[in-house]
């Protein structure tokens, strides 16, 4: 009799047990906020979405993002040589402050972390410090009198802004800020010079950013997977994965080989739960005042499999997909409902449209 080996541990069970343990620790607020951020990041990588984690632990999605990013910044502080006092301070508080340092490099984060700890700043001031350091890092040659220390970067920002103000109150506030953060003596002297030099240096205003907004649903397209060109088999229709959109821009993530098409946000398409598209020709459907058959994009909602007598459906006909209308309920399964037939854009004369002057006339 063959002796069976002991049951090997199931990786899926082990992963699920670990996830449940992390959820329990988060629910009971065990550990510090850095560990919470690492636990939430691990859960999200395992497939838990922020809403699931919120319902299981009470951590709101915004808070989840803050502690995840903050814990990553804290790790940068550890690896890049932040002081022990800084690390000890931020291990128990300040996720909102470290979150604001996320756009800096690892080395800049460590230096900025020490600076924010030394000056006991809040999140709003940390955001300004991060911006000052980021802007200062773009200089190939350092401004006269200022070193590459993050304190001098903040001092330079204050010095530059103070020179643009004629209002003495605002100018004095910025000078005080610069003196507070200045690290080098030369930077301090540059700022102190503003106490006797009241010259105002005007700055060219930044251009208006090219913001656009989607005003209607039609303007925001829906990305739909393409099954392929007929003839196709039922298995090919079923093999296309269900698409999950990420709001607010309907972002679609996918790994692997898959064709996609962007369609306008028509209401019937927005209402579809599981739409896919199939490339076909119009002669597969009854003629609708058309002289020549042409290509069409058939949009099918795989979630709608209930028969009615006023719709077309996709079915498996002798091993291949087909589109049919049924006067009575069919005896075989329905694979989806045809919700839209899209014809290509009509171009009257392609040669004419290449020359805009001909169209204008």
Swiss-Prot record:
A major RuBisCO chaperone. Acts after GroEL-GroES chaperonin to fold and/or assemble the large subunit of RuBisCO (ccbL, rbcL). Cooperates with RbcX in RbcL folding, plays the major role in assembly of dimers into RbcL(8)-Raf1(8) intermediate complexes. RbcS replaces Raf1, leading to holoenzyme formation. In vitro acts as an antagonist to CcmM35, suggesting it might regulate RuBisCO condensation and decondensation. The keyword Transmembrane does not apply. The gene is raf1. It comes from the Bacteria. PANTHER family: RUBISCO ACCUMULATION FACTOR 1. GO terms for biological process: carbon fixation; photosynthesis; ribulose bisphosphate carboxylase complex assembly. GO terms for cellular component: cytoplasm. It is found in: Cytoplasm. Belongs to the RAF family. It holds the Pfam family Raf1_HTH. The keyword Chaperone applies. Residues 221-347 are annotated as: C-terminal beta-sheet. This is RuBisCO accumulation factor 1.
